[in-house]
Regions:
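C-terminal-of-GTPase-core extension/linker across diverse P-loop GTPases
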Residues: 2-7, 27, 126, 130-202, ...
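Conserved catalytic network of the ASCE P-loop NTPase/AAA+ motor domain
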Residues: 66-68, 89, 232-236, 241, ...
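Switch II of P-loop NTPase G domains
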Residues: 20-24, 47-63, 227, 246-269, ...
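Short alpha-helix plus adjacent loop in nuclease-associated cores
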Residues: 101-120
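Switch I (effector-binding) loop of TRAFAC-class P-loop GTPase G-domains
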Residues: 186-189, 210-240, 249, 254-262, ...
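Switch/connector loops and helix/strand junctions flanking conserved nucleotide-binding motifs
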Residues: 14-17, 50-52, 82-87, 104-107, ...
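Conserved Switch II/interswitch segment of TRAFAC-class P-loop GTPases
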Residues: 13, 49, 79, 268-289, ...
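N-terminal accessory targeting/assembly segments
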Residues: 1-103
Length: 392
């Protein structure tokens, strides 16, 4: 495992709590990529330094730690400009990555099909292009590892023109595969399409396995699923298609949204979304916002959806001391029952609280899914009403 340190900032727009949450996520991403986090460095500032992102004092502090602890990699929570990345790596004399680079690296690890690998390679090349000039030339002795997978290692010193040509070739290859996949989606017939969406590592693949009774790769790591899986599901003789899609994440690189167009087409072309949320995460509401932001970017926000709050078995409200006259009770103290009477109540019967691991309330989820798919089916094929009885 590579010795790694993380760097984040606290600003007026991003307070201490939010910064900590982002760094917790970056920590998990680093572990997923194969790194060992030795320490976190955080600096409060009004805005990032245009040359080195953080201030000179913090730069010196980090450099001393790097020298004393044999650090291989420094990862910044925010995307660095090519200039910032170049300047910082020269000062630290080690690999310097940002969140985008790290996510791209994990995707390179997770890609299993030729199509997924092509998508990741395109995203990496697009990220690499403006950073070619002098990028890590002083690190030739340290090839490989986090941030150096895919085209990262083999094309560090490649001419911009060659990378541009490669981007064009990859786009053509993806366009060709997209056409094939579009035809394949068309060949699925008139079955209703349901797409499972949600933040990364919320249990989407586990739910897919429960509903389809088939094995889809599921693991307690970020981006365990990269390739879209589609299964035909039958509930009470009502057939429909269910697809498990790549997880969303805050600060999702735009290169990935563009490169994974066809994967996200499963969401765009879905008739119904199953939005899975990890309710045990302290910032699950912000995760919902991140997913909805991405759905909005791909013009899928207004689709019919069922909100599935997973991992109720892990949910633990923060203890509230009634005798404490200063402390105020807030959302962190809510029980599941109290959450049900917040904004979630407006979702009516389109919200379910489950535990995919313990199979709690899975039958209720199936009934809800049946009813929603049935509504869409009857609207589309009114003469089939008698085939699928309504569940009371």
């Amino acid at each position: 495992m590579e010795n790694t340190i993380l760097v984040g900032i606290v600003t007026q727009a991003q307070g201490i709590e939010k910064s900590k949450d982002y760094l917790d996520e970056l920590d998990f991403l680093t572990i997923t990529a194969g790194g060992k986090v030795l320490k976190r460095f955080v600096q409060r500032m009004n805005m990032p330094n245009p040359k080195t992102f953080i201030g000179s004092g913090k730069i010196l502090e980090i450099k001393e730690f790097i020298l004393a602890n044999d650090v291989n990699t420094v990862i910044f929570d925010d995307e660095l400009s090519p200039t910032q990345e170049r300047n910082i790596s020269k000062i630290f004399n080690c690999k310097v990555l940002d969140r985008t680079n790290l996510i791209l690296d994990i995707f390179a690890q997770r890609a299993t099909t030729s199509y997924a690998k092509t998508q990741v390679e395109l995203a990496q090349c697009q990220y690499l292009l403006p950073r070619l000039k002098g990028m890590w030339t002083h690190l030739e002795r340290q090839k490989g590892g986090i941030g150096m997978r895919g085209p990262g290692e083999t094309e560090i010193e490649t001419d911009r023109r060659i990378v541009r040509d490669k981007i064009s070739l990859l786009k053509e290859k993806i366009k060709s595969i997209d056409k094939q996949m579009h035809v394949q989606r068309g060949n699925r017939g008139k079955l209703i399409r349901v797409a499972i969406v949600g933040y990364t590592n919320v249990g989407k693949s586990t739910i897919m396995n429960l509903l389809s009774k088939s094995k889809v790769f599921a693991e307690d790591k970020l981006f365990a699923t990269l390739d879209t899986t589609v299964r035909k599901i039958v509930i009470r003789n009502l057939p429909f298609l269910l697809s498990d899609t790549v997880g969303f994440i805050r600060k999702l690189p735009t290169q990935l949204i563009e490169s994974f167009k066809s994967t996200l087409d499963e969401v765009r072309e879905a008739d119904l979304l199953l939005h899975v949320v990890d309710i045990s995460h302290s910032n699950f509401e912000e995760h919902i916002g991140a997913v909805e932001k991405t759905l909005d970017e791909i013009k899928s926000l207004g689709k019919p959806s069922i909100m599935v709050f997973n991992k109720i078995d892990n949910y633990e409200p923060v203890n509230y001391d009634k005798d404490d006259l200063i402390a105020e009770r807030d959302k962190s103290n809510f029980s599941i029952e109290e959450w049900e009477h917040t904004w979630m109540n407006k979702l009516g019967d389109k919200v379910k609280f489950i535990s995919a691991i313990n199979k709690t309330n899975i039958e209720e989820l199936k009934e809800c899914l049946y009813n929603e798919v049935r509504k869409i089916h009857i609207t589309r094929f009114p003469y089939n009403d008698f085939l699928y009885p309504e569940i009371n």
